[in-house]
Amino acid sequence: MYKHRMNRAIALGGLVLAGALVSLTAAADDGGSSTPAGVSGKLLLTGGVSEIGGAAGGGLTPWALIGGYGTNDQIGANAFYTRVNAQDYHLDDAGVMVGLYDRVEISFAQQRFDTEKVGGLLGLGNGFTFRQNVLGAKVRLFGDAVLDQDSWVPQVSVGMQYKKNNQDAVVKFVGAKRSQGTDYYVSATKLFLSQSLLLNATLRFTKANQIGILGFGGDKHDSYQAEFEGSVAYLLSRNWAIGAEYRQKPNNLGIAKENDWYDAFVAWAPTKHVSLTLAYANLGNIVIKDNQRGLYASVQVGF
């Protein structure tokens, strides 16, 4: 009962914050095309979109950028919803993020992974769902990916994502050691304005199986492993960007092989207060189903 109440409270808090963000962005738009004083001082699209764990970045991997459009004397925030449809599964993901003075980022996301008919094949029941909460934090150490155009030094940030899965018994049955864990990462991001090109590299230290949906650690490995993640984005205009991502994955479970992830995406930001991202993602093997590919769609609102 307590857990259900906590989950409802968390969800309600997220809805309230999302509603506040929508109200603030609407108010900002009502004020005309000029940027309101004290908010949204960054260039369009330089705050990234929402990664599936809630951090600012690409869809699959966090970037060193601090989310939102707040500069070093401003606060920014985003709320997002993402849907990923593969052949045999789907993922619903929603969350909120606050960026403080272009230095610190705090985020929360809730992921719901629906096994559809595969759940029935596994004896769990059709539509069996894993729910995972992700609490994240990121700190910019040095560099400015946008403003330091006279230097090759990238913006570098460190971050963490604490993840808690609600299906403890199930993930342990498939071989995971635990249903909660923490990822740590370091990201380096550089925007080359004259070439309209953004590059990002992330090194993640993780024990997560399928980003934590299948728990943490396993019969093959139960120690932190360093996994590489990378993104490249090309700015077609001030409102449009295209790009691709790669995310290396660990392989901890003997009965559930795991493959690296890839995607190709297009992002559209008509204003600083809303962005839409569409991607085609290749997720490889997930439990007993190979070649999981599908569409990724995400909407983000904020300032």
Predicted region positions:
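Short glycine/proline-enriched turn or capping motifs at secondary-structure junctions
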Residues: 286-296
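Transmembrane beta-barrel domains of Gram-negative outer membranes and organellar outer membranes
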Residues: 28-197, 205-207, 236-240, 250-252, ...
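Cleavable N-terminal export/targeting peptides
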Residues: 1-46
